[in-house]
Amino acid sequence: MLTNREQMIFNWIKEQPSITQKEIAERAGISRSSVSVHISNLTAKGAILGRRYILSERPYFIVIGAANMDIAGRPDTSLVAGDSNPGKVTMSFGGVGRNVAHNLALLDSDVRLLTAFGEDYRARELKEGCLDCGIDIDASITVPGASTSTYLFIMDEHGEMQEAINDMQIYEYVTPERIEERLDVIQHAAACVIDTNLPQQTIEFIAKNVTCPIFCDPVSSIKAQKLKRVLGKIHTLKPNRLEAEMLSGIKITDDDSLKAAAQELLATGLKR
């Protein structure tokens, strides 16, 4: 819900999209810094998009989840454990949430990403990468002094992963309180997509308080356990076999057991 002042500023922007913050300040009789705060609030609440004062009329999706810097190493020949292996190292943008947001943007959808960025060069590159592909990150969190989420993995010469380290502690900062601060922009979305890199209490807060349809990627069989208490609040789940087995309690070995697992999941209140 907009405050009276925010509604007033919103109406002026609607009447004159090219209005400047200085003009708004003069018309409202407040400082320019105060106008900046109101504009930020309007953006966070989904009333306007970014700094260009584009009014939010087109339906949008919000994705809440991981945005990582992926670092991959692949040897030129057979991997030798405990030794330095000549090969290639590549860096790319990843994270389940970011990847979903990227694909939505490729489909020409209006998409916003709520994630946690650190305060390092990887965060700068990730943010630029999101903006370059059309992902709005105004709702995201920047954690002072923190390291941006990073996923490091080593493959063998065939491209099969052998070892990996994930540094994802930063998502502990995506707390229920942070979500509550951004609840307006989440509620106005056509749908909310989450992944289970979020803390369990945050997932449960979203499930209990967000009224738009919630879509979820369980990420892994271990992280999928965070969903057990809120499956009935989720609209659509995208599990693989291991995740479906863990959540349904049914071992999937053939078509019949697959259908039984699906029915068990749907019985929780899950729509799809």
Regions found by a protein language model. Give the residues of each.
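Structural motif
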Residues: 60-61, 190-191, 236
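Conserved phosphate/ATP/ADP-binding segment of small-molecule kinases
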Residues: 211-214, 218-272
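Glycosyltransferases and closely related glycan-assembly transferases
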Residues: 202-214
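Short gly/ser/thr-rich secondary-structure transition/capping motifs
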Residues: 44-46, 172-177, 216-222
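Conserved N-terminal subdomain of the carbohydrate kinase-like
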Residues: 57-58, 76-88, 106-190
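Glycine- and other small-residue-rich loops at beta-strand/loop junctions that grip anionic moieties
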Residues: 28, 115, 194-196, 216
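Short beta->alpha connector loops
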Residues: 119-120, 196-200, 218-222
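Glycine-rich phosphate/adenosyl-contacting loop at the front of the ribokinase-like
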Residues: 4-5, 14, 19-23, 27, ...
